[in-house]
Regions:
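A short beta-strand motif that forms the metal-chelation/ATP-contact edge
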Residues: 183-185, 247-260
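A long amphipathic alpha-helix within ATP-dependent nucleotide-binding catalytic cores
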Residues: 202-251, 262, 273-288
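Protein kinase-like catalytic core scaffold
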Residues: 133, 191-192, 237, 250-253
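Active-site nucleotide/adenylate-binding loops and adjacent lid/helix of ATP-dependent enzymes
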Residues: 2-9, 14, 19-20, 24, ...
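Conserved N-proximal alpha/beta basic substrate-recognition cap immediately N-terminal to
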Residues: 10-114
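Short, flexible active-site recognition loops that position polar ligands and cofactors
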Residues: 260-270
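Short glycine-enriched loops at secondary-structure junctions
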Residues: 70-72, 91, 196, 242-247
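Phosphate-binding site of ATP-dependent enzymes
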Residues: 147-232
C-alpha cells in the first residue's frame, strides 16, 4: 500500500527527523510512505470527479494520506475521492476549532471550564468573567495566542490587536495553573499520559520551557478519556486536560496534528510504530 505524508514545506524542514522516522516505521510494516508538500499538491475538481497533481503532473491516487497540517478542506477533498485520511475530516474540523470541540464535550458531559465564545469583530462591552481569566485563539495550538487577562487594560489591548477573529474566554477559577496532562491516543487506545508543568508560565507547554513526566491515570480519569474516544473516530491525537484543585481532570483541548517529542523525552514508547500499525490495520479493513 502507498500512502502520502502531507506537510507544508516550512514545517517539513523543522520536522525532518520526525518525517524520516515516520517513513522508516512504515517501511518496517511494508507500507510505502511518500512525503508530499502541500504547496506542490493540486486537486482538480471536475464534473465527473477529481484528479491529483504534484508540481503540475497528474499522479496516481494513494491508498491513504496522513495530513500533518491544520485545516479540513484537504481531508474533505481526499475523502470525496474515496481516499482514507488520518486524521479524518470530521476529527480535524472539530479539533481545530475550540468552540466546536467544546460543543462536542458538552454533548457527552465531559467536565470543562466555563467558556464563552468571543468574536473580535463584535467584541463584548464587558469581560465575561471576573479577573483573572484566560483568553485564547479558537484556532490556535501549541500555546500560541493564549493570554492571561488580569485587568481591563490587557483585556482591551488583546481584543484591539487580535490577529484572528475567533477567541474563547475561560474562567480559571479552581484550576491549577502551569500544569496540564496530555493523553496520547491512537484509534480507540490510550497509549500514555504525560504531566507537563511550568514554574514560570501559566501555560505548561513543553516547547515553552515546561517539564514533563509520565502520569498515571486513575480509573475515573481513564473513564473520562474513554468517553471522549468513543465519541470520535481518531487516528492519532493528543487530548489535553487541566487539573482542578481537587485533582480531577478538566478538559482543555484536542491536538489534531500531535507530535511525539514529549512522549519520546519521557518514555521508550514508539508512538509512530503504534500509529503505523493502526493505519495498516485500518486500511486492511477498508480494503476488504
Amino acid at each position: 500500500m502507498i500512502g502520502w505524508l502531507i506537510y507544508r514545506k516550512e514545517d517539513a524542514i523543522v520536522n525532518y527527523s520526525y518525517i524520516q522516522w515516520f517513513k522508516q516505521e512504515a517501511e518496517k510494516q511494508e507500507l510505502c510512505l511518500k512525503l508530499v508538500y502541500d504547496e506542490q499538491l493540486t486537486i482538480q475538481m471536475e464534473t465527473n470527479g477529481s484528479s491529483l497533481k504534484i508540481e503540475g503532473h497528474i499522479v496516481d491516487k494513494p491508498d491513504f494520506v496522513i495530513i500533518r497540517k491544520m485545516g479540513t478542506l484537504l481531508q474533505k477533498q481526499f475523502e470525496a475521492m474515496k481516499i482514507t485520511t488520518f486524521n479524518n475530516a470530521e476529527t480535524a474540523e472539530i479539533c481545530n476549532h475550540k468552540v466546536l470541540t467544546y460543543l462536542e464535550m458538552q454533548k457527552i458531559k465531559v467536565s470543562m471550564m466555563p467558556t464563552v465564545f468571543i468574536s473580535t469583530v463584535t467584541p463584548p462591552e464587558k469581560p465575561p468573567f471576573n479577573y483573572p481569566f484566560i483568553l485564547k485563539s479558537a484556532t490556535g495550538h501549541g500555546g500560541t495566542n493564549v493570554y492571561w487577562i488580569d485587568n481591563e487594560d490587557k483585556w482591551k489591548q488583546i481584543l484591539k490587536t487580535a490577529i484572528t477573529a475567533d477567541y474563547i474566554a475561560q474562567s480559571c477559577k479552581d484550576i491549577q495553573t502551569g500544569k496540564d496532562v496530555r493523553v496520547f491516543v491512537i484509534g480507540q487506545q490510550i497509549i500514555a499520559a504525560v504531566l507537563r508543568t511550568n514554574d514560570n508560565d501559566f501555560r505548561a507547554n513543553f516547547k515553552l520551557g515546561g517539564k514533563a513526566s509520565l502520569f498515571e491515570l486513575a480509573p475515573t480519569m481513564e473513564a473520562t478519556i474513554k468517553k471522549i474516544i468513543n465519541h470520535f473516530n481518531f487516528g492519532m491525537v493528543g487530548i489535553d486536560f487541566l487539573l482542578h484543585n481537587n485533582g480531577n481532570l478538566v478538559f482543555n483541548e484536542i491536538e489534531d496534528v500531535v507530535g511525539s517529542r514529549i512522549l519520546s523525552a519521557t518514555s521508550n514508547i514508539n508512538l509512530l510504530e503504534k500509529y503505523i500499525t493502526h493505519i495498516k490495520q485500518t486500511m486492511e479493513t477498508v480494503r476488504k
